[in-house]
Amino acid sequence: VTPLPTRRRLASGKVRDLYEAGDDHLLIVASDRISAFEQVFPTSVPGKGRVLTAMSVFWFRELADVLPNHFVTCDGPLIPESVRGRALLVERLDMLPVEAVVRGYLTGRGYSDYRRSGAVCGLPLPPGLAESARLPEPIFTPSTKARRGDKDENIDFGTCVSVLGRALAEEVREASLELYRRGAVRAAEQGLLLADTKFEFGIGADGGLVLADELLTPDSARYWLADGHQPGVPQPSFDKQHVRDWLVDPASGWDCVSPLPPLPPEVVTATRDRYVEAYQRITGLSLADWPRDPADLRQPASRLGQCGGTGDRRDPHRDQDVHRPRRSAALQPR
């Protein structure tokens, strides 16, 4: 846990710690912790928290025209110096109880579902697709938000509608698909494929939908090199797959039941290098320069009214068939 004596800690996830920052805002601190199979390793990956924060800030600013997001700043007096570079001041939201997953390629749990049923989250796909194959169109495959230690469960869109209401579920789906498309275009320009990603959303003070949590980071998105992409086999990715591969190798000594063992130095270094490379490829910036110009550490002025919850956007769901989430104390960190 990241110690901040002057802040009240609200929650801790596998990677992030959440603190109070007044009535309308929260402070999210990304640690260097790394997890696998719903456990946290005793070994951290130096600089990982900075990568997650820097990459989220880049994407929050890059995609702010698609949908308002909760990011306010990662600079200024509300950011303690001890966590500067890996902390975000964000708007407090009513979080939706559904994760929005978009898949552009057939991999991971999506591929497992397809092999078993020919569909992913109730969406039928063409027969004969290989692992890592590009899908005809990106698909929206929501999931539940599991408690810590449990696994998220894929759900179909009908179940998503029953949880959120039709109007809100459709808005979440359309926003998620557009965010994915925009992210995939940027990734392609940098020689990467955005295989899949997850988004989280909440409801702001004005009743509108707001993008939350992290955005298109190596922890929440699967990036592959476009060069050498080969359907039919798993692809090397810019995330913690290297850690998982080491862990399931018999040489690690892990029995799938005991607490996770320490990571070898070479695995830590290789993992850090993949995270840093993902950031530098996507942004064209050096992580060594983060945090940089204060003007790049805040939401653009034109967006602050919306992202701070004080804008005058009309609630798109008012008087429509929508289920409001119960008032939650905080975003639950992962």
Each predicted region: which residue ranges?
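A long amphipathic alpha-helix within ATP-dependent nucleotide-binding catalytic cores
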Residues: L164-A195
